[in-house]
């Protein structure tokens, strides 16, 4: 049986994600962000609820990306996720994209020219953000064209780069429905942005989200729930440069901006520059929130849930892979577990996110 990996956030899970799972082949393993997202935001609903939604709509296994993989720039996010999926035996990687191109060809380009491409990046001025630099790199070395807002396409390029030397088949699937950032409700396949914007519209949510009750009946989290914690961390921290990726310039800008900022958007707008993108600033503010310092990654893979078919695959891997199905006295990943504890502080109804939790199990009627 073909084993297909999918890297996702499911923030939240919606009909477009269901379409991706239905279109992908074989047994589907999801490497999913935990309770904080790649762009530096708390998850709308917790990782366990999102895992359950995925497993009820086509996923066979859901594993958790550690904090220092989840909350990273596209290249590090892709590299960390693909490394985990390769340990779980994937043969191909499926992903949605605005532009279906020959990503397999791009793997070969990077395998042949990685040194030149990396050297080229270092020649570009620091006035360009890292995403702008990587786009220029792909334009020069592979003739890739960029038009408008295509975050999934850009992430696809990171997947190609991270897949070099790994013998993975990339399977791009054309993104259907609304654009990534669209807030338009007039789509059967509405975007996650639109769903987050219109959470109070039950009719819209029920048509846009499979198993919508799981979304509606659980706490909805945003930066608003954590801004006071963040403000305290910034004002009381003796040395922000001890936080991951915070340099002297950013520390100074953040310390000044927090004194006049009433919410996260105002703070991000005040700190961001052409060099420091808003997404990068949000990630750094997330690092400050959870007091993240030098990144370390766990050896084990945390299993959030599986179907009967997924369980059969995991049994084959158990002896050769460090699979974590329950976090107890022995920690899995200290940083992720600390981030989970802070996530819980945002709402009294968020249950324990780490200790004692066991995987969600969805029984398949058939194991074909």
From Swiss-Prot:
Report the domain of life of the source organism. Answer: Bacteria
- Give me the Gene Ontology terms describing cellular component: cytoplasm
Q: Where in the cell is it found?
A: Cytoplasm
What GO terms are given for molecular function?
A: ATP binding; ligase activity, forming carbon-nitrogen bonds; tRNA binding
Keywords attached to this entry: ATP-binding, Cytoplasm, Ligase, Nucleotide-binding, RNA-binding, tRNA processing, tRNA-binding
Which SUPFAM superfamilies does this UniProt record tie to the protein?
Nucleotidylyl transferase
- Which Pfam families does the UniProt record give? HIGH_NTase1
What this protein catalyses is:
cytidine(34) in elongator tRNA(Met) + acetate + ATP = N(4)-acetylcytidine(34) in elongator tRNA(Met) + AMP + diphosphate
One of the GO BP terms on file: tRNA modification
Q: What is its EC number?
A: 6.3.4.-
Top EC group: ligase
Disulfide bridge map: none
| UniProt cross-references to InterPro entries, sorted A to Z | Rossmann-like_a/b/a_fold (IPR014729), tRNA(Met)_cyd_acetate_ligase (IPR008513)
Ligase: present as a keyword of the record?
yes
Residue positions annotated to bind ATP are 7-20, 96, 152, 175
Report if keyword Nucleus is assigned: no
Q: What does this protein do?
A: Catalyzes the formation of N(4)-acetylcytidine (ac(4)C) at the wobble position of elongator tRNA(Met), using acetate and ATP as substrates. First activates an acetate ion to form acetyladenylate (Ac-AMP) and then transfers the acetyl group to tRNA to form ac(4)C34.
- Tell me its family: Belongs to the TmcAL family.
Cross-referenced HAMAP family: TmcAL
Protein name per the record: tRNA(Met) cytidine acetate ligase
Name the source organism.
Streptococcus pyogenes serotype M1
Its lineage opens with: Bacteria, Bacillati, Bacillota, Bacilli, Lactobacillales
């Amino acid at each position: 049986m073909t084993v297909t990996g999918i890297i996702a956030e499911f923030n939240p899970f919606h009909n477009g994600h269901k379409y991706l799972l239905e279109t992908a082949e074989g047994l589907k393993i999801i490497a999913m962000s935990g309770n904080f997202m790649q762009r530096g935001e708390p998850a709308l609903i917790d990782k366990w609820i999102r895992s359950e939604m995925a497993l009820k709509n086509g996923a066979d296994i859901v594993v958790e990306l550690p904090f220092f993989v989840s909350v990273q720039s596209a290249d590090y996010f892709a590299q960390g996720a693909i490394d985990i999926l390769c340990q779980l035996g994937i043969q191909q990687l499926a992903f949605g994209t605005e532009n279906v191109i020959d990503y397999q060809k791009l793997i070969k380009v990077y395998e042949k020219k990685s040194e030149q491409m990396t050297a080229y990046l270092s020649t570009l001025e620091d006035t360009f953000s890292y995403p702008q630099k990587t786009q220029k790199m792909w334009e020069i070395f592979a003739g890739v064209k960029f038009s408008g807002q295509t975050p999934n396409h850009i992430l696809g390029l990171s997947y190609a780069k991270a897949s070099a030397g790994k013998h993975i088949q990339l399977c791009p699937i054309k993104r259907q429905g609304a654009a990534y950032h669209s807030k338009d409700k007039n789509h059967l396949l509405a975007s996650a942005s639109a769903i987050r914007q219109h959470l109070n519209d039950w009719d819209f949510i029920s048509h846009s989200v499979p198993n919508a009750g799981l979304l509606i009946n659980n706490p909805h989290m945003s930066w608003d729930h954590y801004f006071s914690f963040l403000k305290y961390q910034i004002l009381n921290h003796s040395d922000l440069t001890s936080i991951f990726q915070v340099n002297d310039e950013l520390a100074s800008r953040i310390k000044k901006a927090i004194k006049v900022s009433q919410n996260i958007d105002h703070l991000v707008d005040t700190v961001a520059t052409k060099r420091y993108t808003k997404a990068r600033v949000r990630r750094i503010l997330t690092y400050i929130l959870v007091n993240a310092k030098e990144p370390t990654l766990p050896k084990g893979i945390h299993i959030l849930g599986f179907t009967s078919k997924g369980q059969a695959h995991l049994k084959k891997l158990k002896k050769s892979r460090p699979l974590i199905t329950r976090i107890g006295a022995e920690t899995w990943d200290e940083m992720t577990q600390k981030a989970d504890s802070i996530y819980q502080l945002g709402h009294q109804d968020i249950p324990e996110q780490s200790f004692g939790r066991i995987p969600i199990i969805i029984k398949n009627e058939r194991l074909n």
